[in-house]
Amino acid sequence: MSSLPQEAALPITNTLFPPPPPYFQAFTDEAIERYETLTGKSLFVNDEKGKTKGKEKKSDDRDMSVDIRIQDLTEEEQNEKLELEGKLEKPRADWVNEDGRWMCFGTMYTTEPIIPTAQSIGLPPFIDPAVEPQESLPPLLHSFLHTLLLLLDTLTMTARTPNELAAAGWASEGDQYIQHLTNLSANMMVASNQLRSAQSEATLVLLMEKELEERRKQTEKLRSKCKEIASGIRALKGL
C-alpha cells in the first residue's frame, strides 16, 4: 500500500509511457449518463439520417422529442447541460478556423504556420529584410567565424583585473563576443527557417530525379532481358 503514493509521485521521465491527457477524467459513467439524460441522445453512437423515409420520420420525431425535453429543463439543468457539452462533445473546428489559433496541452498553435523573424523574437537586425536568406547566410557565417576567432584571442590574452571588468559591465572578457555569437546563431536559424520553401522544392526535385534514375535503371534491365530472350529465341529457331 505504501508503494502507491511513491509510484504516483514519479516524474514523467521515470515512467514507461507518458500519462494520458487530463481531459479523459471527464468521461465518467455518471457524466455520460447525465449527458444522455439531459440531451436525449447518445454520446458515442452517430445517428444515421436520410437513408429511408421511415428512418427520416423516426429521426424527426426523435428530434422533436429532444427539443421538447430541452425546453422543459430548468435553468440549473441548462447550465449543467452546457458544461457537459463543453467537456464531452467534439471541439468546434469552425471556431478554430475563425479564431486562427488553438490551444493543445498548454501550447498555442496557429492554423496558418508563421515563420518567425528576427524582429518578432527581439533579435538585433543583422539581416536586411530585402535580401534573400540564401544571400544573407554566408556573411552571417563569416561574421560568426570572425567573432569566434576574436573570442579565442581574447581568452588567450593576459587576464584583466576584476575592477576593470566590473567597470565595463562584464563578468568575463568574452561576454561581448559570446552575446554576439548568440545573436548571430539566432539570426542564422531565422534565415534558415525562411528557406523551408526552397528546401522543400529542392528535396522534391531530388526525389523526382532519384525516381527518374530508378526508372531508367529498370528500363535498361528490361531491355537487356528482352535482348537476352530474343537471342535465345533466335538460337532455338536456328536448330
From Swiss-Prot:
Cellular component per GO, a single term: core mediator complex
Keyword Ribonucleoprotein on entry: no
Predominant cellular place of this UniProt entry's protein: nucleus
Entry keyword set: Activator, Nucleus, Transcription, Transcription regulation
Locations listed in the record: Nucleus
SUPFAM superfamilies for the chain: Mediator hinge subcomplex-like
Gene Ontology terms describing biological process: regulation of transcription by RNA polymerase II
Region annotation Disordered: where it falls in the sequence: 1-21, 43-66
Bias type Basic and acidic residues, positions: 46-66
Oligomeric and partner information: Component of the Mediator complex.
PANTHER family: MEDIATOR OF RNA POLYMERASE II TRANSCRIPTION SUBUNIT 7
Protein name as it appears in the record: Mediator of RNA polymerase II transcription subunit 7
Organism per entry: Cryptococcus neoformans var. neoformans serotype D (strain JEC21 / ATCC MYA-565)
Organism classification: Eukaryota, Fungi, Dikarya, Basidiomycota, Agaricomycotina
Name of the gene encoding the protein in the UniProt record: MED7
